[in-house]
Amino acid sequence: MDALFGDELERAALVDWRPLAQGLHARYLVDEFGAAVRFVAALGEAGDALGHHPRVTIGRGFVDLKVVSDDATFRDGDTVHVVQWVTQRDLDLARSITDVAAAQALTADPASVSQVELGLDTARSATIAPVWSVLLTGDPAGQGLGSPSDEVRDPKGRLPNLWFGDATGEPQRFHVEVYVPAEVRDERLAAVVAAGGTVVDDSRAPGLTVVADQDGNTGILCVA
């Protein structure tokens, strides 16, 4: 299926969900673990009906969900790439999940979802990616998984993705990308500044804002 991007996702009007990095994310609040289990069981049935299922994390008082397709396609010139991204299948699953949550009287908390990725600046991603793939995931297949680049992704979805950027000559080569919903971006940025951080580069804001701590270590606040 075709990968869906910005305007297409916005037109879907999935009020319980937020696009972060490659997938759609949602959080539903639950009173107890048993309620979480019942919710997830119902999601299993909904997913079976569509032949597609979410990734699920159960925590104290919440159920976190991510929907993404492993076989999304997009065209770059004459080349067709198969990637991990959102497709129509994911929109259909997200709507079905929203219906299940409504039937169980669960409340969505979309402003609380987040996604973390790691970045490493290098001029030799093809050379070093195999090392990071086996170190992080234990599997060489993590290199380029669901991506046309050398990006490292855990085949089992346990770890943050590691992507490779251009070498800049700066002493810090690792940095963290934090994806947040658009409606909490300003609040999160203000909290960083209030804690002593500084804005280093907001030329691509609100999509990307580079911030730094008091020692000059940088991170990137992202809105997908």
Report the location of each language-model feature.
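A cross-kingdom feature marking charged/low-complexity
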Residues: 2-3, 61-110
